Amino acid sequence: MRVLFVASECFPYVKTGGLADVVAALPAALRELGIDARLLLPGYPPVLAALGEARPLRDLPPLPGAGVPGGRLLAGTGTADGARGPGALDPAVPLYALDLPAFFGRGGNPYSDADGTDWPDNALRFASLSAAAARIGLEGDGEGWRPEIIHAHDWQTGLVPAYLRFAAERTGAKRPVSVFTIHNLAFQGLVPPALLADLDLPPHSFSIHGLEFHGKIGLLKAGLYYADKLTTVSPTYAQEIQGPAMGFGLDGLLRARARDLSGILNGVDLGLWNPASDPLIPARYDATLLEARQAAKAELRHAFGLGSVPDGPLFAVVSRLTHQKGIDLVLEALPRLLALGGQLAILGTGDKVLEQAAAAAMHDHPGRVGLVRAYDEALSHRIQAGADVLLVPSRFEPCGLTQMYALRYGALPLVSRVGGLADTVTDVTESSLADGSATGFVFEPVGLMPLIHAMERAAALWRRPDLWRTVQRNAMGRDVGWAASARHYADLYRQAVMDTTLLSK
C-alpha cells in the first residue's frame, strides 16, 4: 500500500504543536507494517537543508492567483544535514519538499511573521502545497511512484481532497483515496470568497454542500466535505465534535459523516521520549529507579528559580498559554496550590494577557512560581523528568501529547476529562489503585473548584510516597507508543480503498 502524507509542519524541522510530532512519527510506524508511507512538506529552509543534495523530480505549475512562479518537487530522506538524532525524521521515510521560495523561504513560523502576524497569503501558500500533493496523486512523483492514498492534515491541506475530487470529475481520471485528519477543529482556515478562482476552485464548490462556511471559503471544511475518510486524534474527541459545544459550527456536517469518521489516538515517539536513554535530562531512569528523578527535580527547581525544600508537590505546565489550555484556571487556583505547599513551573508562550499574569505570579511568589516564556524542547524534557504533577486543565483537547510524555516520565498528569485526556489518563480512585490502572488525576467539569479538588487529591497522594510511586510505575508502564495506532490507520486505509473500489463499480 502506497500512502503520501502531506502536512504543513514536521518535527524536528518546523514545529508549532503536536501536529509536527504526529507527522514525524506515524509514517515511520506505518513503514514498520510494510506500508510505503512517504511525506510531502513545504520547502521551508530547515526542510531544504535537511534534504541537502535533493533530487529534483518535476516542475509544478502555479495556482492561477499565486502571483509567483511554479515550484519544484524535490526528494530525499531528510537526514542530509547530519542532524539525525533523537526525534529526527526516520531515514526510512522518503521525504518530498515543495521548493517554492516565494511562499516558503521566509522567517518567522510557518503561518506568521516574526511579530506573530499571519502571512496575508497563507491561503495561496498552503493551497499550493495541497495542489502539489493532488498532482502527485493524479500523475505520480516523476520517478514512477504514485500513492493509492493521500493522508492530509488540518486546514492547511484541506484542499487536497477537494482538488482530487474536482480533477476526477473534470477529467475522469482515477484518483487516489483521500483521508483527512482533524488535529484541532478550532482552526478552520477561513478566507474570503474572492479567492475562489485564485485557488483554482470551481464556482459550484462555493456552496453549503461544498466548502462554503458562513460566507467564506472554509479550508478545513473542504477536507471534511470532500475526503473519503475522516479521522481525528482520539475517540472521545471524535464524539465531542459531533455536538454543538465543541463542533465549532461543523457538528452537523460531522454528524452527517459519522460513518466515515474515526477517532484514533496519537502515540509517542518512544525513542525520543524515553527517560532511560534521554540525553536531555540530568539522570536517566526507569520505573525501577524512580529515586533518580530527584536529580532532575533539583535541576528543574534551579532552572525556574524555585526553592529547594517545598512542603508539597512540584506542579508544572508545558503548554501554549491560552484560554483553551485552561491556563487562566491554573492561575486562579494558584493560592490553593501554594497553600498545599506546592510549587509551580510554567513553560510556554501565547496570549499576552496570560503571559503577563503568569509573570506577575512569579514576581509575587518568588521561589514558589517560575516562568520561562519560550518554546524549549530540551527544557520540556527536563520538566517531564523533574515535575511531580503535570497540569493539563484544557477546556477541549483533541488528543494532547504532553500528558502522554508525562505518563512516560512518571510526572503524574492532572487533566480535565475531555478529548484525548479522557482517553489516556485513568483517575486515581480506590478501585483503580486496587486493580493497578490508576495513572493520574482526572476532573470534571472544567472549572476552578474541580481543578482545586484534583490538586488537593494530588497533594494528599504525594504525602503517601509508597502509593505515589505505585501510581508512577503504573503510568510509566502504560503503552503510549505508535504501534497500535499505526495498525488502526492501516486498517482504515484498507477499508477506505475497499469502499472506494466498491463505489466506483
From Swiss-Prot:
It comes from the Bacteria. Keywords: Glycogen biosynthesis, Glycosyltransferase, Transferase. Pfam families: Glyco_transf_5, Glycos_transf_1. GO terms for biological process: glycogen biosynthetic process. Pathway: Glycan biosynthesis; glycogen biosynthesis. SUPFAM superfamilies: UDP-Glycosyltransferase/glycogen phosphorylase. It catalyses: [(1->4)-alpha-D-glucosyl](n) + ADP-alpha-D-glucose = [(1->4)-alpha-D-glucosyl](n+1) + ADP + H(+). InterPro entries: Glyco_trans_1 (IPR001296), GS/SS (IPR011835), Starch_synth_cat_dom (IPR013534). Its EC number is 2.4.1.21. GO terms for cellular component: cytosol. One of its GO terms (molecular function) is alpha-1,4-glucan glucosyltransferase (UDP-glucose donor) activity. ADP-alpha-D-glucose binds at K15. Belongs to the glycosyltransferase 1 family. Bacterial/plant glycogen synthase subfamily. Synthesizes alpha-1,4-glucan chains using ADP-glucose. This is Glycogen synthase. It comes from Rhodospirillum centenum (strain ATCC 51521 / SW). The gene is glgA.
